[in-house]
Amino acid sequence: ITANSRAPEERLGDLEAQLAAQRVGEKRLLAMVETHGEARVSAHAEALLEYSRRMTEAVIERIPDGEYRFEDAMEGDGQGEFHIPIRVSLRVMGARMTVDFSGSAAQVAGNINAVEAIVKSATWYCVRLLAEDDVPVNAGCFEPVEVITPPHSLLNPDFPAAVAVGNTETG
């Protein structure tokens, strides 16, 4: 992994920090299971997922059912100047939301492409901003929100598309 980076020492430090955090989390989880039992810890984890899902659904239910559209564009990809549309359609039905980026530009040669994970993360973050209370971030809060990113697009490019700026500008 680090061989594919211009700053391998930095990436190695990042990876080591992530691994250390995972090891601490593993120890704490095992300690909770030791103290409270696997069934009880699992039940509480499921309850937390359900709580986050319900809180996110409540946020979505405050939005009137319907379809909402928005379009913007970038004026170039760093390789040249041309119109690069980003289109989104937001469909709300009760406690469910679909955010569809179909119709957005195809992937480009420059580094403004954004990988699907960035687009989903930015979308879910926007939904969370609508919440009046803190929503615990876990898989439960993602369930009511479907994010569609068309393949081969600016927002879901094929490997090895350039994506460096997509993390901050496009996503």
Q: Which role fits each region the language model picked out?
A:
Residues 9, 30-46, 60-72, 132-146:
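Flexible, glycine/charged-enriched surface loops at secondary-structure junctions
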Residues 84-103:
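Short beta-strand elements
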Residues 45, 108-119:
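Alpha-helix N-cap/helix-initiation motif
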Residues 1-55:
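N-terminal leader/propeptide and maturation segments of large enzyme subunits in energy/redox metabolism
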Residues 77-81, 97-98, 105-109, 137, ...:
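Flexible loop/turn segments at secondary-structure boundaries
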Residues 18-21, 25-28, 55, 59, ...:
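Stable alpha-helical structural segments in soluble proteins, enriched in small hydrophobic residues
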Residues 66-89:
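Flexible, glycine/threonine-enriched loop-and-boundary segments that flank and lead into catalytic domains
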Residues 12-13, 110-111, 115, 124-171:
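Hydrophobic core positions in small helical hairpin nucleic-acid-binding modules
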